[in-house]
Amino acid sequence: MRRLLAQWLGLLLWTALAATPLWASSAGSGGPGLVYEVDGPNGRFYLAGSMHLLHAERASLPAPLERAYRDSTSIVMEIDTDDIDEERTAARMLAAAQLAPEASLPILLGEARWTALRDALAEAGFDAERASRFEPWGLSLMLTQAAFARQGYTSAAGVEQQLTERAKRDDKPISGLETAEMQIALLDGLDMNVQRQMLDRTLEELREMPQMLDELDAAWRAGDLPQLEALLLEGYREMPELYTALLVERNRRWVTQIRAWQQAASPRLVLVGALHLVGEQGLPALLQRAGYTTRRLTVDAAAGE
């Protein structure tokens, strides 16, 4: 079983709740990243695949993404990271992740799974007794975020936080395709069997974290679509319900929103998790089927502008 952990990147609300230091602007990293120029009936915009978490020592952005940001007068993200009440959102997420008072996590999980979870929680520094009041989806995110942080990958260094801070300084408005409440409700509405599958994969793959994160970061910077698809989509073959809920339905809603946009005088930059740009149900493929044309931006093209 392979690397489903990478797929939680697209839904980690910690992106919106982290500290946001001011990252110095850079000339961009050497690879092309994952950036498209999209043309359609309502004008031109950029579509970029993001890494919500990056390593603080490797936080520079690909040159095509830098170009897309410079050329855009507004930013569209999964959620509006500039308009979130952090304390309120954190409280809602914690409340949503709580088990019902009468529920018992050890009984819901079974003895073997509970033992493995308790060991993983202890290794990550969490109190198992307190954590036992959370639903499996919340525990999956907790363990994943802790594992990312141990390897130096943080949302404070991630693409959204960097561009949020820059957009504030550059007076570029930010909007969201969804709200934090919508993402919380999506996770909290997952069937318990799906949540158990999520937790199983998280526990199985924690040991692979260092290699997986570095491979994912390298593939994203290189714009290596086959490798990104292998890393990000492979686990969904055995979890079709999760794939439909987290990817297919959301991508289709976003395409509907994009098609409803009024024509703008200058381009927007649409920035979503890289997971949403790969595969037959990825945004580029869906937009093409909706009559849009897409063109990958290269390093040479970015340098020539």
Regions found by a protein language model. Give the residues of each.
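Structured, acidic catalytic/metal-binding patches in enzyme active sites
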Residues: 32-246
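A cross-kingdom marker for long, charged
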Residues: 241-305
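Alpha-helix C-cap/termination motif
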Residues: 7, 68-71, 261-264
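Cleaved targeting-peptide boundary
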Residues: 25-32
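Short hydrophobic "helix-edge" motifs at membrane interfaces and signal-peptide entry regions
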Residues: 11, 39-42, 263-264
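Positively charged n-region of N-terminal signal peptides that target proteins for export
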Residues: 2-4
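Bacterial N-terminal signal peptides
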Residues: 8-21
